[in-house]
Design a protein with these regions (language model features):
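A glycine-anchored, Pro-Gly-centered beta-turn/N-cap motif
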Residues: 69-73, 120, 624, 652-653
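Active-site-proximal, structured, solvent-exposed surfaces of multi-pass membrane proteins
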Residues: 579-699, 703-704
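Short beta-strand-plus-loop segments that form exposed binding edges in beta-rich domains
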Residues: 126-134, 661-663
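Membrane-embedded transmembrane-helix bundle of lipid-linked glycan/lipid transferases
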Residues: 2-29, 148-553, 658-704
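Glycan-recognition and processing domains
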Residues: 6-72, 78, 83, 88-90, ...
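Short, flexible loop/turn segments at beta-strand junctions in immunoglobulin-like
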Residues: 66-67, 115-117, 647-651
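Extracellular carbohydrate recognition and processing domains
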Residues: 94-121
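Extracytoplasmic
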Residues: 189-190, 212, 216, 235, ...
Length: 704
C-alpha cells in the first residue's frame, strides 16, 4: 500500500486549508445563545407596577440565576413608564460586572445595553429598579451571549476530517472500506447524545469543564506547561493540572481561548474520544496478533461497551475515558515486550505515557497489570532475553513523564492534598449480576464472544486472545464482591483504597475481553458479516442506555458556563476552606495604598505605595511557586488567612506590583529532560521509518 500522499491529495489538503483560512479571515456567522422572554422572581412578561395600586419603590425581580462564562453580553428590554428607572445586574460570587447598573429612558420603550463579565459568574441575576415615576411595565427581557466561534471550528474540523477519511478510503480494499464504514457507524452511534445543541450534564461534567477552563486560564496567564490555573474556586486557583495531567486537553483549552463555547468543546471531546477509541483498538488488535475480522469485532465491542458509555455519559469520567481510548496501545506494547517482538518496546512506552497523561488511577491499574503479566511470562522473558526491552520501555516512560511526576511529588511534599473523597471501598464492589446482565457493565456481546473463543480450537497464534481472556476474567472478579476486598484493605493498610472503587478494574477487563471476544466472533468464515452482526448486537444492548441519555439526560445548556465554585477541596493546601472564597477583595494590613488593581487568572498587577511595613492578602491560594516583584525587584510572599497568598511591602515601597505563578527551577529541568527525550524518540522513529522505506524501495527495484 502506497502511504505517500498523491499530488491530488496534496492539492485537496491545500484547498481545505485555504478554505479554512478564508473562514478565519472573513468570519463565519457565529453562534449565539438568546435567553428570550426571561422571567424574574415575581416579574414575568407584562408585569406592571403602579404606586396607585400599592406598589412601592424598590427592587423587583431577581433571576434567572445563570452560571455564565466571562465575556461581553447584551441585554435587551421592553420597559415602559413615566420615570427614569434602572436595571441592576448582580451575581453571587463577587465578580464586578461593568456596568452594574443600566438606566432606562421613559421616552424609549425598547432599548438595549452591553455589559462585560471579566470572569465567570455564579447565579447571575437581573433586578428591576422602580425608583421614579408613577408606574413601570415590563413587557420583555432578553439576554444575548457573546458570539462564539463554534461553527468556524466545526467547519474546519469537518473539512480536515473529510480529507483524512478520503485519503484512508482510497488506500483500502473492499473489505477495509467495509471495516471503516462499520467503525464510523459505531463512533457516530455512541456520539448521538452530544449531536445536539447542548452537552450532556453528568456527575463530573462541571469538574472537568472547570479543568479545561483552568487550563485555558493558565495558558492565558503565560504558563507553559500549566501547573496552576486561576479559574477554579472562584478565581482563587487550583493545582489541578499537576495532579490531574491535562496535556492532551491543551487543544481544547486553545479552542476556548479561540472563542469556542465550553459546551461545544465538551461535545467535540466526546465525538473525538469515540473515534479515537475505535481507531486505536482496531489498529492495536490487528497487531496483537489477530485477523482483520477479529480486530474489527474487538473494536466494535469496545466502542459500544456499556461500561465505557456509562463512564462517558453517566459520570463523564473524562480522564478515565481518555485513558481507555489509548489503553489498547498500552496492551499492544505490553504484549510485544512479553510475548511478541521485543524490539517494538517503544509501543509500550508510548502507550504508558499517553495513559499517564490521561488518568493517574488508570496508570496504577496498568502498572498492576504489567506486573502480573511480567511475573507470568518471566521464565520465557529471561530465556528469550526480553528484560532489556522492558527496562528500556520503563526508562523512557519515566523520562517522558518526568515533567509530570516531579511537580506532583514536590507539591505533595509542600502540603498540597490530592483530594478528600472518602468512599466505602469494599462496599462499592459490584454484585455479579450487575456485571453479567445483557446490558450490564460487561454485557451480552462480550460474554458471547468469550464463549465462542472458549469453544473454538486454539490457532497457532491464539495465545494473545486466551491471555486477554484470562486477565480480563481476573479483572472482572476483582471488580465484584466475590473478591475479599475488606481483607485486602486491611492487608494493605488501606493503600489499595487509592483506587477509590473496585469496579475500576473493569477499565482493564473491558478492552481485554473485547479483544478475546473479537477473536471468538471472527473464528468463523464469514468475518465481515459477523462483524456487522456484532455491531448490531452491541447497538441493541447499548441502545436503550444511549436512547435514555438522549431523551431524558440532564443537559449543560449552550451559552452557560461551569460553576466557578468547587465543592470538595481537591488539590488544595491542607487546611484550606474552599467555601470561604466569596470575597475577591485585596486586603491591606498596615499603612499602604493600592490603586489600579487588576487581576487576570493567576496574574495580579497594581500600583502600591507603603508608608510603613505592610502586608497585602490577595484573592489567590498561596501555592509554592508564586513570585511577586515591585518594579522588577523581588518581594517576600507567604501564606495568610485561609492559605491566601500574602505579599510583604517594606516601608517606603512604591511602584508597580506584579504577581504571577512561575515554575520551580527543578520543574524547568524536568521539562527540558522530558522535551529532549521526546525529540530524541521522534527523531529515532523518523530515521527508522525512512530507512525502512529505502529498503522497501530497494527490494521493489530488485524485483523488477
Amino acid at each position: 500500500m502506497n502511504r505517500r500522499l498523491t499530488r491530488g491529495e496534496i492539492f485537496a489538503l491545500l484547498g481545505c486549508l485555504a478554505l479554512i483560512a478564508v473562514i478565519a479571515a472573513t468570519g463565519m456567522p457565529g453562534r449565539q445563545k438568546v435567553w428570550a422572554n426571561l422571567g424574574l422572581d415575581g416579574m414575568q412578561a407584562q408585569t406592571e407596577l403602579r404606586l396607585e395600586a400599592g406598589d412601592a419603590y424598590g427592587e423587583y425581580g431577581g433571576g434567572p440565576y445563570l452560571d455564565l462564562p466571562a465575556g461581553t453580553y447584551r441585554l435587551r428590554w421592553r420597559i415602559s413608564g413615566d420615570g427614569a428607572n434602572a436595571i441592576r445586574l448582580s451575581c453571587s460570587n463577587g465578580v464586578e460586572i461593568a456596568p452594574e447598573r443600566l438606566s432606562t429612558d421613559p421616552a424609549v420603550w425598547e432599548d438595549e445595553a452591553v455589559f462585560t463579565l471579566p470572569e465567570a459568574v455564579h447565579s447571575f441575576s437581573i433586578h428591576i429598579c422602580f425608583c421614579d415615576g408613577t408606574y413601570l411595565r415590563m413587557d420583555d427581557l432578553r439576554l444575548y451571549s457573546p458570539v462564539y466561534t463554534d461553527r468556524a471550528w466545526a467547519a474546519a474540523l469537518l473539512l480536515l476530517g473529510a480529507w483524512l477519511l478520503a485519503v484512508i478510503w482510497r488506500r483500502l480494499d473492499a473489505q477495509g472500506r467495509q471495516a471503516l464504514a462499520l467503525l464510523a457507524l459505531a463512533a457516530v452511534f455512541t456520539s448521538l447524545p452530544v449531536l445536539r445543541e447542548d452537552a450532556v450534564l453528568s456527575i463530573d461534567t462541571q469538574f472537568h469543564a472547570a479543568r479545561i477552563m483552568n487550563l485555558a486560564d493558565g495558558l492565558r496567564s503565560g504558563q507553559l506547561p500549566v501547573r496552576v490555573g486561576g479559574f477554579s474556586y472562584n478565581g482563587y486557583g487550583a493545582a489541578t493540572s499537576v495532579f490531574y495531567p491535562d496535556a492532551l486537553l491543551v487543544p481544547l483549552a486553545l479552542m476556548v481561548l479561540g472563542g469556542a463555547s465550553i459546551t461545544f468543546v465538551l461535545q467535540l471531546f466526546t465525538v473525538l474520544v469515540n473515534g479515537l477509541t475505535a481507531a486505536l483498538m482496531y489498529a492495536s488488535a490487528r497487531r496483537m496478533p489477530g485477523s482483520r475480522e477479529a480486530a474489527l469485532c474487538a473494536s466494535l465491542l469496545y466502542v459500544c461497551s456499556v461500561y465505557r458509555l456509562r463512564g462517558l455519559y453517566e459520570t463523564f469520567m473524562m480522564g478515565q475515558v481518555l485513558a481507555m481510548a489509548v489503553l489498547p496501545l498500552f496492551l499492544l506494547g505490553l504484549w510485544e515486550v512479553c510475548r511478541g517482538e521485543a524490539k517494538r518496546w517503544p509501543l509500550l512506552s508510548a502507550g504508558a505515557t499517553l495513559i499517564v497523561q490521561s488518568h493517574m488511577l488508570t496508570t496504577l491499574l496498568c502498572a498492576l497489570l504489567a506486573l502480573c503479566a511480567v511475573l507470568l511470562c518471566l521464565p520465557a522473558m529471561l530465556r528469550e532475553r526480553r528484560l532489556p526491552a522492558l527496562l528500556k520501555a520503563a526508562g523512557m516512560t519515566l523520562l517522558l513523564n518526568l515533567w509530570t511526576l516531579v511537580p506532583m511529588v514536590t507539591l505533595c511534599l509542600s502540603g498540597v492534598n490530592t483530594g478528600t473523597m472518602q468512599f466505602g471501598f469494599s462496599g462499592s464492589a459490584l454484585e455479579l449480576h450487575e456485571v453479567l446482565l445483557p446490558d450490564g457493565f460487561i454485557g451480552l456481546p462480550l460474554l458471547l464472544g468469550a464463549a465462542l473463543l472458549a469453544g473454538t480450537k486454539a490457532p497457532a497464534d491464539g495465545r494473545a486472545a486466551r491471555l486477554c481472556a484470562v486477565f480480563g476474567a481476573g479483572a472482572v472478579l476483582l471488580s465484584t464482591k466475590l473478591f475479599p476486598w475488606s481483607y485486602a484493605v486491611r492487608l494493605t493498610g488501606g493503600l489499595i483504597e487509592v483506587l477509590q472503587f473496585p469496579w475500576r478494574f473493569l477499565t482493564l477487563a473491558v478492552p481485554l475481553l473485547a479483544f478475546a471476544a473479537g477473536c471468538g466472533y471472527a473464528s468463523g468464515r464469514e468475518g465481515t458479516r459477523m462483524a456487522a452482526a456484532v455491531l448490531a448486537l452491541s447497538m441493541l444492548c447499548a441502545g436503550p442506555y444511549v436512547g435514555q441519555v438522549v431523551r431524558e439526560g440532564e443537559q449543560m445548556r449552550f451559552g452557560e458556563g461551569t460553576n466557578p465554585y468547587m465543592i470538595l477541596p481537591e488539590y488544595q493546601i491542607e487546611g484550606t476552606d474552599v467555601g470561604d472564597t466569596r470575597s475577591r477583595t485585596l486586603l491591606v494590613e498596615g499603612d499602604a495604598q493600592v490603586t489600579a488593581y487588576e487581576k487576570e487568572g493567576t496574574r495580579i498587577s497594581c500600583a502600591v505605595s507603603a508608608q510603613s511595613d505592610a502586608v497585602l492578602t490577595l484573592p489567590l491560594f498561596g501555592f509554592a511557586g508564586y513570585e511577586a516583584t515591585l518594579d522588577g525587584e523581588p518581594l517576600a510572599v507567604g501564606l495568610g488567612e485561609n492559605n491566601r497568598l500574602t505579599v510583604r511591602l517594606p516601608a517606603g515601597a512604591q511602584g508597580t506590583l506584579r504577581v504571577r505563578f512561575v515554575n520551580w527551577p527543578l520543574w524547568r529541568v524536568c521539562d527540558a529532560v522530558s522535551l529532549l527525550t521526546l525529540m530524541a524518540a521522534v527523531s529515532a522513529w523518523v530515521m527508522r521509518r525512512r530507512k525502512r522505506m529505502r529498503v522497501m524501495q530497494s527490494d521493489s527495484s530488485c524485483a523488477r
